[in-house]
Regions:
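GHKL/Bergerat-fold ATPase module
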Residues: 1-182
Length: 182
């Protein structure tokens, strides 16, 4: 990038800088899959991406990069899932607590959300306490739903319960016993 003489800033109205921003946006959209293939795409890597949207308003010089990252994460299976695989934002759910991830496996998530697509829990290390910026980004920018105990209670239906095995009900009642608010 071309900088100011003191090298403390990057002029926004410079044609070369505008071209470089566009090229960087294209590159980051393309390279994320390769980073995944190399085994380097992790929760900590996602935290290094431009996910603090308040730092990049719509008129920011670097907004095209932010937009490219967002669009790529929405479309492609690049978010670390709890089972060690990856999932796109549209097929991802955040669990409020490890017990919820343990209670509902992939098949049950699909049944609960009445989806024919494979829905997966995001990696358990993505939490309000450990990764607040990433969690907020996933929810507000990528529209990933956070499933809470209350949300589970509202979503459970007769059709969902009728297809669950007896062993699951033992786990379910054990889970409910730890949820005083329900």
């Amino acid at each position: 990038y071309r900088t100011t003489p003191s090298r403390d800033n990057i002029p926004k109205d410079d044609d070369w800088n505008e071209t470089l921003v566009k090229e960087t946006a294209d590159l980051i959209g393309d390279i994320l899959s390769e980073i995944k293939d190399l085994g380097l795409l992790s929760v900590s890597f996602l935290e290094a991406l431009p996910i603090r949207t308040e730092d990049f308003p719509d008129d920011s010089m670097f907004y095209p990069i932010v937009e490219s990252v967002r669009n790529t994460l929405i479309k492609e299976e690049l978010l670390p899932a709890d089972d060690g695989s990856f999932v796109s934002a549209g097929n991802a759910k955040l669990a409020r607590g490890a017990d919820l991830r343990k209670l509902l496996g992939q098949v049950q998530l699909g049944q609960l959300f009445q989806s024919t697509a494979t829905i997966k829990w995001l990696a358990g290390e993505i939490t309000q306490d450990r990764t607040p910026d990433l969690r907020s980004y996933l929810i507000s920018e990528l529209d990933v739903e956070e499933v809470t105990p209350d949300g589970l209670a509202r979503r459970i239906s007769h059709s969902f319960l009728s297809v669950q095995p007896d062993e699951w009900f033992v786990d379910f009642y054990g889970y409910l016993s730890g949820q005083e608010a329900l």
